[in-house]
Amino acid sequence: MGCGLRKLEDPDESSPGKIFSTLKRPQVETKTEFAYEYALLDFTLQASTNPDVIKINSVLDIVAKVEDYYLKGYVVGAIHPVIQPVGQRKHLPASHLYRAVLSRLKLSPKHSAAGGQRRARLVMEECPLTCEAQANDAAKELMDKINAAAKRGMKFVGLVSQCYLPSMHCNGASHDGVAESGLHVRQDSQDNCKGWNEGALGGHLSESGVEEEPQHESGQHQTERNSSPSYANPKRGEAPDGKLYMVFNAFEEDAASWAYQEGVLSMKVTRKGAVISALDANWLELTTFYYKQGFSLIDSFVCWETPKGDQLPKSLEGFFIYEEEGSGVPGSNRRGNDAIVVEQWTVIEGCEIKTDYGPLLHTLAEFGWLLTSVLPTPILRHDSEGNLATKQVVFLQRPVTWNSAAQTPERKGSRLLKGEDRNKVSSRSLGLDTNASQAAGGRAPLEEGSLSPSRECWTKEERPAQSDSFSGFSSSDSVLRELDDGQFDQEEGVTQVTCM
């Protein structure tokens, strides 16, 4: 065992996931008085042979589908598409898959009384918004809408978009969900989705992304019903080709008003043609300032597509949406939050999710870690079995405990970085380009403005998606057990990489 960087001989050898945290691994696995239970629900706008994947005609249908869970004390913490439907990716069957993450408190015996828990219901509101190049205008418009709803007692959950569907799906179902023939459609769905994964995207995807995705629809199928916008990139000033919804938890009784604000989100991007093939972002540098102030990271907003006629940018500017003072998170009254950020490969077999962040999430739930946001990306690849895989970024938080607070002193580097300060900080590639992945395999010591000394990055290099779960991301007694405590010795101001 050593800390030499492994050369990625093949794209399939890239890491199944990386974990970044403001804590060392032993602190992450320290139990608190609170724990969570999670329920993960998958939805599809298409027919599916898997009974565990819930068929919906619109993302608005999710509201009714989760009602029974709300009666059991669960609330939705995040709703997100499985892949980021950008450009031709909107034609992929997987672009019609959505995930809802629900959680409920698992109280200790001394907190067994549930009287403090308020009954909530899920609410979705359409949010007309133009996807202009400048994120500042979008941020102000969105934040005004979110804060206006918060004053009515609505707790913000996130944003979810739905692209317009073609009149015929890959499974042969019509736009309104009526199938030509039930048995035929189910078989057609499975065959066509398999064709997309194994054939249509071919070798391009195993490298870095979809260079050119063939159009399976005929001319008449490429035209949307009811004169809906086409799949083409929007022109400047036009709305994106879909709808954007704001998701809230609304409470029956009067609730304290929540307040929300935006924070910087900046990502460097690598492209092959117009396709985004890799991302670089310093997640903890961007968010730690807010976590230390007791804010909760709720969601993010990024305009992934470039208006026609514009030069393709080398970076994407968006914003995170934070809830002030961690409102609604048990025990976080004006206390800072510790954070975990997971870069996770999610594998899709056919039209169904095969491997994802679920096992890790259930393990961390026992230690009081709350999932607050999932950022899907447009980065795609094939695993060794020919299945589609996409990169997702998962954000979890937990109120700072006395021990962790004592070992994470405030440093001048724990602040919001802007402009050239942010560019000084080294970053880790999320993409599939072999050279970028090699460079990202280890993080060099940070320059001035570095992270606090206890901030960690955990990584294990294994071939992804060859079994039901990734090695190191399994549903064993401890997902993190393979990480040796002794590997977390580090020097002042240096973020370490655990090399296996």
UniProtKB/Swiss-Prot annotation:
Phosphothreonine carried by residues: T408
Compositional bias segments (type: Basic and acidic residues): 213-224, 409-424
Protein name: Raftlin-2
Main location: membrane
Cellular compartment(s): Cell membrane
A Gene Ontology BP annotation from the UniProt entry: dsRNA transport
Record function comment: Upon bacterial lipopolysaccharide stimulation, mediates clathrin-dependent internalization of TLR4 in dendritic cells, resulting in activation of TICAM1-mediated signaling and subsequent IFNB1 production. May regulate B-cell antigen receptor-mediated signaling.
